[in-house]
Each structure stands twice: as structure tokens, then as C-alpha cells.
Amino acid sequence: MVYPKEIKGLTVRLRSIMPEDAEITYKMRMDREKVKYMHQIKGTVEDQKNYIIQQQKKEGDYLFVVLDHNDNVIGMRGIYNVKENSAESGRTIGYGDAFQNMEALLLGLDFAFDILKVDKIYMDAATDNQSVRGIQMQIGAQEYKRGFHEGIEYEYVFSVLSRENYQICREKIMRLIERHTNRFGRKE
């Protein structure tokens, strides 16, 4: 689906992915280090463009590109499988600094909680992916099981984030982002 507005933060903003983003997002998806724990893709830039066109039509599926304040695409974020009161968060690739990547995650979660009005968000991370697992704990997600995704060799930790836990943890993280932004200015 396409969300018609930009979602603006202090260091980044999100906008719905468009077919013209195919080349840059294809390159991101082909970066072996960044997608080590994700489903591997095959195909071409044209295949990525077709995927984006189909994704835009898919009910309850939002895919965003992350932009810095110079309009550079520095990542991707997804909110998908939106149901009555829940959604999933993932499809995350980040090339920004730690503050930009964290704020991009928060903006996606804000979108799910505040715009889509879900009460909980499901997410997962490879057990070996300590950085993502650490971030999930920082935002208040709670593990509920471990298991495997079809076609991926790594064990995964499956977590759920409630609106209540997120609101408590979000304030602390935003204070850090604000302090960074005030100290170093906007990332240009």
C-alpha cells in the first residue's frame, strides 16, 4: 500500500517506496552484509520494480524508504501483515548512522501505533544478530518464542511489542536522539 504522506523525524523521514526507487533498493537488497539474516533475492532491477508495483497494491503492507535531510535514500523499513489490532515490523536495511537508523525504526513503529492504530507489533531477529536483538529489547519488545524461517539457516527470536511498553521506551530513546541532534545538528 502507499501511504500518501511523508513521516518526518529529527534526523530522517520515511516515504512510501516508489517504482523509481527500484535501483537503489535493489542494490541494498544485494548487499550481502546488510541482508545476511534476510531472505536472499535473485533477479534484476526490473524485478525489483515489479515487486514494488505489486507491493503497493497489497492490502496491509507498507514499505518505506528512509531519507536523510539531503534526500539521500539511506534505508528501508516495512510494516506489513496489518490485521485488526496488530502488524509486523521488518524488511529493515539501514545505511545511516546509529541515530538515523534508530529514528527510522521509531518512525515506522509510530506509523503502526498512531496511524494504523494497532495495539501490538510482531518482529523477529536472527539469534546471532545481536545488534537488532539489542534494539528490540531497547524499544520494549518481549520474546515469546524461538524458531526458524523457511529458507533461512539461522534460528530466530520472535518478539512482540505492546503499545504500552513502546511508549515508555520511546521517550528514553527520543531523548538520546534529541540530545545528539542538538549537539551535532541535523545530519545533513
Where are these regions (language model features)?
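Acyl-donor (CoA/ACP) binding surface of acyl/acetyltransferases
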Residues: 1-24, 28-31, 63, 69-188
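A generic secondary-structure signal
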Residues: 51-54, 111
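Conserved GNAT-fold acetyl-CoA-binding loop/helix
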Residues: 33-52
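Short helix-loop boundary/capping segments at the starts of domains
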Residues: 31-34, 57
